[in-house]
């Protein structure tokens, strides 16, 4: 559907460009015919022609309407940004000359209808952090089902998988309300069982985060070479993928799973992998390549001396590195 929509809009824009090329000639022919048929109104016709917009739109009502929308939209910064996100390349691998799209929309917030209340200055929480939260879970009729203060690792899903993902991105002291779709009411605990045929309302307050190693969104740039409206990867889910780490200062490749011939099999939130891996995978749709620019310190593991990807000693912690993730297969 996404490719079809992109194709339709591309065709409309190309159609409009063609009309821009040929409309001056059509205007001249029309002017000559009008002048020959009625010489007495030459001055009036000329004045009318000079006052007309330079673009002449032909076709049926639908074509003219869509063309006007495209033209007017491209005159604004918002319109240009819209088409930048819609008219994306449909190729797979990235290289520096390819066109990529900066990721602006958090699909996870949309999926869970998350609303954030209050503010905090410690965080944000990432998949793999140990958090202490107070939560309330109700049915859609606001009947309270479960209420507790609990400490757990994000991604372990001791209550329900959806709750872990609602907490991602929170600051200590913030509160969130969300709706957990039935599919994400599953958990890894035998103590709390939710019926996965129903949606649930969740209210949660974040009380603490450990360890206090954070990925700040303003220090990281994330780009995708393809976008699609699909269910994204979530904290606690398993995925296979290829990863490549490049040092931006000299182009040296520090790690390349494809060159090794061995894909990475990872549960998002596994603290034996670099923190930036879980951060980048959270909310990713499993198509195309995701490119992440971040400092070397974010490639350290979260509270573990074991790093399955790259040794801490070889990491240039204060330099920016490029991480490329692709060839996704969700387990």
UniProtKB/Swiss-Prot annotation:
Renumbered to this chain, region (Disordered) spans: 33-54
Enzyme Commission number(s) of this protein = 5.2.1.8
A Pfam family per the record: FKBP_C
Residues forming the PPIase FKBP-type domain are 128-226
What are the alphabetically sorted keywords of the record? Isomerase, Rotamase
Q: Which Gene3D superfamilies match?
A: 3.10.50.40
Q: What name does the UniProt record give this protein? A: Putative peptidyl-prolyl cis-trans isomerase RC0542
Organism listed in the record: Rickettsia conorii (strain ATCC VR-613 / Malish 7)
């Amino acid at each position: 559907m996404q490719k079809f929509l992109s194709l339709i809009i591309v065709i409309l824009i190309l159609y409009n460009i063609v009309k821009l090329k040929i409309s001056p000639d059509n205007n001249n022919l029309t002017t000559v015919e009008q002048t020959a048929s009625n010489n007495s109104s030459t001055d009036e016709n000329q004045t009318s022609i000079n006052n007309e917009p330079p673009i002449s739109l032909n076709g049926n009502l639908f074509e003219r309407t869509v063309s006007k929308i495209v033209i007017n939209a491209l005159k604004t910064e918002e319109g240009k940004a819209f088409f930048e996100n819609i008219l994306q390349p449909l190729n797979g691998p990235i290289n520096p000359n390819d066109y990529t799209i900066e990721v602006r929309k958090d699909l996870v917030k949309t999926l869970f209808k998350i609303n954030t209340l209050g503010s905090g200055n410690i965080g944000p929480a990432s998949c793999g952090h140990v958090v202490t939260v107070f939560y309330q879970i109700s049915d859609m009729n606001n009947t309270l089902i479960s209420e507790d203060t609990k400490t757990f690792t994000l991604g372990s899903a001791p209550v329900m998988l959806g709750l872990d993902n609602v907490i991602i991105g929170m600051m200590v002291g913030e509160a969130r309300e969300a709706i957990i779709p039935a599919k994400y009411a599953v958990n890894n605990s035998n103590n709390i069982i939710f019926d996965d045929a129903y949606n649930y309302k969740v209210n949660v307050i974040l009380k603490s985060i450990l360890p206090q190693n954070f990925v700040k969104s303003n220090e990281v740039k994330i780009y995708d070479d393809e976008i699609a409206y699909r269910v994204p990867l979530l904290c606690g889910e398993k995925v296979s993928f290829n990863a490549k780490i490049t040092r931006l200062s000299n182009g040296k490749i520090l790690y390349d799973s494809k060159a090794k011939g061995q894909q990475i099999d990872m549960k998002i939130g596994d603290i034996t992998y670099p923190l930036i891996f879980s951060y980048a995978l959270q909310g990713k749709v499993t198509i195309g390549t995701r490119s992440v620019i971040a400092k070397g310190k974010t490639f350290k593991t979260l509270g573990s001396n074991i790093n399955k990807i790259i040794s801490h000693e070889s990491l240039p912690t204060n330099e920016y590195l490029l991480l490329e993730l692709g060839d996704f297969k969700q387990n």
